[in-house]
Every structure is written in structure tokens, then in C-alpha cells.
Amino acid sequence: MAILTDWPWRHWASQTPQSISLNEPVALIADETRWSWQALARQVDCLVHHFTQQGVTADSTVALRGKNSVQMLFSYLALLQCGARVLPLNPQLPDAVTEALLPSLSVTHGLCLNDNPWPNAVRPLSLAPISLPSGSLLSDDIEERCRADLRWQADRLATLTLTSGSSGMPKAVAHTFAAHLSSAEGVVRMMAFSASDSWLLSLPLFHVSGQGIVWRWLATGATIVVRAHQPLDSALRDCTHASLVPTQLWRLLSEDILPAALKAVLLGGAMIPQALTQQAEARGVSCWCGYGLTELASTACAKRADGRSGVGLPLHGREIRLVDDEILLRGSTLAAGYWRDGKLIPLVDDDGWFHTRDRGRFAEGEWHILGRLDNQFFSGGEGIQPENIEAVLLTHPDVQQACVVPVEDVEFGHRPVAVVELAQTTTLDAVRDWLQPQLAGFQRPVAYYALPTELKNGGIKLSRQQVKSWVKAIYPSSNRSLSAAGR
């Protein structure tokens, strides 16, 4: 990886030819348009000028709301170059959450790419048109001023990324540029991602995994591909690397539409069947999986997928230990803190360890993540870790998402309920019948519900707290008595 002394896009622009010809570096493929690093850097400078004219400074905190697009990517880079702390937001985040959250994060400006209004205290920004990658966008004197503005500082705060909020209101995790780049270094070493490769921006920028793709691209001078409105097989054209969930890879293989250029995938979001990775590897696609979290700027541990439940070993720059069954992490990818009320709140103990609240163990040469310490509940004296039930559910080929939460029960204290998102090819009854023999009696859900649209928040992870509240509101009160069905 390069040693950066300037903004990454400027660094790579200084290293590569201005025009794009066969076999020369391409920075960005947006649909079918190819951008050189020079053209990309000029477009970023143009947007920096546009945003600074609207009052964005190095002291600003800017919320950036929208789905993945070339406009979203350029805005992200330009706001970083302005020196602002950039907070990418899920466009499906409820208004009530946004209105409660943004004032506490001292958000000064907001750029919305989906026309939703901002709370009154947030000054809305407009976006200049993204020009085609040719010609000069700024006069020479303005371009020179852009270059003379804020200088690259790797240890400066760059981004605020919301946690999933799975147990309540999301927290804003603050990362420096250096932390993002260190996170990228571990993954690109593992997956042999280099300047001659390309990665599809398949995950949202409001999630740390989506930003991880961007920083791997910036760290290596490779190509990023943005095709947000195309089917997956079309979007993957020209891509050597991709971040996928198992159901996406299954479809590419089963429909025989796996792109020829694809050579490595980072899998997440569900259990990964060995049969899937064996098929992919037979087609020349290496499969990787692991364990990541927002506070560690994405991936903390990883390995070549092998059908076993472990998550491998810590990547370069990360350390891991186990204390009272809890996973603790530290390293160069760790966030600077949680951002609230205009300041950083520490997230580590006196020795620099972050307490994840994840249960874990080390066995057979790798780490295993057993679930959240605060998710466990008891039913008739038996401890239930909902992630264990979810893991079995997610091995069903037609289960796309699953969340298991407790409901109160007079006799047993609590019982599990499953909320699942299914493909149209199966039913809740069929999934229940399939699951029953695979679980102990106390683990079997007493009810199954289809995941409602309002809980599909567009993120990588469902909010367990929201699912729990929704189930509590609809679960029959009679089922909380001794006559509860399904026992």
C-alpha cells in the first residue's frame, strides 16, 4: 500500500496518466462511464468549492443521506476534503430517530439525495451536477485555492458511522482516516486486492462495510464500480472482487450467471454453507468470511470460508482477547470514540481494549462468536442465545433474514419468537416444520412472523430492539399465559 501524503484521489492522480486508454488505470466505473484519477480529483475539487461556498468548513459535521450512487460517492469524498466530519445516513431511518439524533451529534449541514427534509437546526446543502469525466471544471485560480485549502492529515477525524441501534438509539462511531486505511490494509493483504483489481460498491455507504469498500479502493489505487440500478450479474461486469451475502452468490451460481472476471468474494450477513463455497471455488472464485463491527472500521477477524462456524484470526493491526467469555478488541483500526454533543466519548478501557459485549471462545485454531451477552434470555431455566436459532434459520435457502426475540411467558419466563424474511418460494409453516427437528424443545419458537416492511431499514443488520417492540405489540396476550400454544 502507498504511503499517502495527500488526499488519496490526488495521490493516485499524480501517479497515473490523465486520459484512459487500454490497460491504463481506471479510478471509477459509474455504470458504463470510466473516470481517470485526474478527472475524479477535478470533480472532487469542484464539489469542495461548491460546498465551501455554502458554508461547510473544517469545523462542520455534515449528514449525507441517500442510496449508493456516483453522486453519493463524490459527495462523500468532497465533504471529507472540506475537512468536515461526514455522517452517512440510511435514507430509511425514521424521521423521529433523525430528529432526536442529529442535534445530539452537532450536525450543522445536511445533503439529502432523496428529497427528505432536515430538522430545522440542520442547514440543507445543494449538490452541483456531476460532469462527464473530461475537460476542466474550475478556473485555474479556484482550482489552486482548492488545492491550498485543507491539507491531508491521516490522524484527523473523518467519518461518523451509526451503529445498528439493535439495542436502542444508534451511537455515532468516529473514525480517523488512518483507522479506515489500516482496516483496508488488513483486508487487501488477505484477499490480494491490488491496483489492477476492481471492487463493486454493493453495500451502502451508511454502513461501515460499504465504507470499507471505498477505503480499500483508495488505499490501493484500484477501481471502484458503481452500478446501483443494475441487476447483480450486470453490475459485477469488470469486477474482480465483491462483498456479497450467501443468497446472492447462490443465485449467481445456480442461474449460471457468475461473471467471468470475478475472482474473490467477501461473504457476510448469514451462515455460509460449505456446499456454496465449494461450488464457487470450483469456478475460480475464492470465498472469505469473518467478524466485523462498526467500532473496528469493519472487518476484525477473517479467513478463507471453509464451512466451519469460526471467524478465523485477527487481521493485521488488530488484537483480540477473551475476558469472562467476552471478546475484547484493540488495534490501529479502532475508532477514536463515540461522537456526542461536539466531543469524543472514549470507548476503550484503561489498557486500550474495546469491550464488544460479544460472547466468544477460541477453539480449533480460530475464534468463534457465540452471540451478544445482552441478547441471552432464559426459558424454564434454560439459557437461550437467539443468534444460535438465527444461525440455523439462515441455513434454509429461502430464509433471507431472521431475528429471534423473547416474549414473556407465565410458566417459562420467556419463550422465543422468530421474525423472518422469506423468498416467495416458501411459507412460514414450511420453515417451522423444517426447523423443529433441528432444535431442542426449549429453543423452538412458539410463533413465526413475516418481517414487516417497516423493519426492513435497508441496513446490514436488523434492529433487534425494533423487532422486539413490534413483536410485543402484536403477540397475543393469551400466549403469555399458561395456555400458550406451541410448547
Question: Where are the language model's segments positioned?
Answer:
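Gly/Ser/Thr-rich phosphate-binding loop
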Residues: 241-244, 252-308, 319
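Conserved ATP/PPi-binding loop(s) of AMP-dependent carboxylate-activating enzymes
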Residues: 310-314, 323-351, 372, 382-384
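AMP-binding/adenylate-forming catalytic core of the ANL superfamily
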Residues: 331, 359-443
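Conserved C-terminal "lid"/linker of ANL adenylate-forming enzymes
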Residues: 377, 403-409, 417-421, 431-487
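Conserved pre-ATP/AMP-binding loop-to-beta segment of ANL
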Residues: 5-6, 140-162, 169, 178, ...
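AMP-binding/adenylate-forming
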Residues: 103-114, 158, 171-255, 264, ...
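Conserved AMP-binding/adenylate-forming
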Residues: 49-93, 383
